[in-house]
């Protein structure tokens, strides 16, 4: 990517998301999504390679299809209601098409097919933006229009996403794909609680972004893209071992770490609304998600690969990349659960 064009591209990505998030008019919401999508394609291909080009094409085709469905849905809604406001979506078919388009943009099942492949084909920094920042605009639209959507549709999408995300990550050796399937699972949890308490969805999104950012920073610091490379961390950056373990367990939702907080709040909200079957299914399926993170920790922290090299450890000579945000983010990924009553009491 041209260094001169890089600030303009990132500014356009930021502006597109901001327009969509702050808009109450369907046309401007669509316009922001388009700006964001077109500006994000150069971000995916900033390190030119056949794999990143393929990933960018897959991303463009999927997002363009979702945008066409979204535009058709808002025109259909305007034709029947005469309204352009996002909070006034009275036609059920329009609502269904909008949710379908947003689910495709979020990478929720059964429209998840592009997320692992695109994440695998791009650099770590681009993958981080894809799995965090690019979720903000679709979630903001869904947040505004959730009263117009059938709860059963959202629950079906959510449970299916949790199932696909948890099951799909079991057989992976590439860390990019594992984090992509984890993203699908987290999207399912966020959308599931949206009809009951949208504020918990926002809390879940903030915690998810914090955990995912911490994980990507650790992987970038360690230059790890596969489980095999991650297993050599003890020889490269010994001090990073406890950080990897706590972050991955928190991302899997193990108590008493921060990642358990949104799941706890969501299950409690379902119980308040006398819905016990859905959270039970979601919690049981999420154990698969926790399992493949526990497997990563076992390979990384507990097993010790045989080494025939008797020289000094590599970490004694290697210069560590600067990561000023990592200590703060690591604390947030592990220690927010004790103050959960304070967090949940915020209106």
UniProtKB/Swiss-Prot annotation:
An MF annotation (GO) of this entry: NADH dehydrogenase (ubiquinone) activity
GO CC aspect terms: mitochondrial inner membrane
Principal location listed in the UniProt entry: mitochondrion
A single GO BP: mitochondrial electron transport, NADH to ubiquinone
UniProt keywords, alphabetically: Electron transport, Membrane, Mitochondrion, Mitochondrion inner membrane, NAD, Respiratory chain, Translocase, Transmembrane, Transmembrane helix, Transport, Ubiquinone
Recorded topology in the membrane: Multi-pass membrane protein
Pfam families per UniProt: NADH_dehy_S2_C, Proton_antipo_M
Record field: transmembrane: 13-33, 55-75, 96-116, 122-142, 151-171, 178-198, 199-219, 237-257, 277-297, 326-346
Compartment annotation: Mitochondrion inner membrane
The reaction(s) this protein catalyses: a ubiquinone + NADH + 5 H(+)(in) = a ubiquinol + NAD(+) + 4 H(+)(out)
Record-listed E.C. numbers: 7.1.1.2
Domain of life: Eukaryota
Subunit structure: Core subunit of respiratory chain NADH dehydrogenase (Complex I) which is composed of 45 different subunits. Interacts with TMEM242.
Similarity comment: Belongs to the complex I subunit 2 family.
Job of this protein: Core subunit of the mitochondrial membrane respiratory chain NADH dehydrogenase (Complex I) which catalyzes electron transfer from NADH through the respiratory chain, using ubiquinone as an electron acceptor. Essential for the catalytic activity and assembly of complex I.
Protein's name according to its UniProt entry: NADH-ubiquinone oxidoreductase chain 2
Gene: MT-ND2
């Amino acid at each position: 990517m041209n260094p001169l064009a890089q600030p303009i591209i990132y500014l356009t990505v930021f502006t597109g998301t901001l327009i969509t998030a702050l808009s109450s008019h369907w046309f401007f919401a669509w316009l922001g999504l388009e700006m964001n999508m077109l500006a994000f394609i150069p971000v995916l291909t900033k390190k030119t390679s056949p794999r990143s080009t393929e990933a960018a094409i897959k991303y463009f085709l999927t997002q363009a299809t979702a945008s066409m469905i979204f535009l058709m849905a808002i025109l259909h809604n305007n034709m029947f209601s005469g309204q352009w406001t996002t909070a006034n979506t009275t036609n059920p078919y329009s609502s269904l098409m909008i949710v379908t388009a947003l689910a495709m943009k979020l990478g929720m099942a059964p429209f998840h097919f592009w997320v692992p492949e695109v994440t695998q084909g791009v650099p770590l920094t681009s993958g981080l933006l894809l799995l965090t920042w690019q979720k903000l605009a679709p979630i903001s639209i869904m947040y505004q229009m959730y009263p117009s959507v059938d709860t059963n549709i959202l629950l079906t999408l959510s449970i299916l996403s949790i199932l696909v995300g948890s099951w799909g990550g079991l057989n992976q050796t590439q860390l990019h794909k594992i984090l992509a399937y984890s993203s699908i699972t987290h999207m399912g949890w966020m959308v599931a609680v949206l009809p009951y308490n949208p504020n918990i969805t926002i809390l879940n999104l903030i915690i998810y972004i914090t955990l995912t950012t911490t994980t990507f920073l650790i992987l970038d610091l360690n230059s790890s893209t596969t489980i095999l490379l991650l297993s050599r961390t003890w020889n490269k950056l010994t001090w990073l071992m406890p950080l990897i373990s706590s972050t991955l367990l928190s991302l899997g939702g193990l108590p008493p770490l921060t990642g358990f907080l949104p799941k706890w709040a969501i299950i409690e909200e379902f119980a308040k609304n006398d819905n016990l079957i859905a959270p039970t299914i979601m919690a049981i399926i999420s154990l698969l998600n926790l399992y493949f993170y526990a497997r990563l920790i076992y390979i990384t922290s507990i097993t010790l690969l045989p080494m025939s090299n008797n020289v000094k450890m590599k970490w004694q000579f290697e210069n560590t990349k600067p990561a000023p945000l990592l200590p703060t983010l690591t604390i947030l990924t592990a220690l927010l659960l004790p103050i959960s009553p304070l967090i949940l009491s915020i209106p």
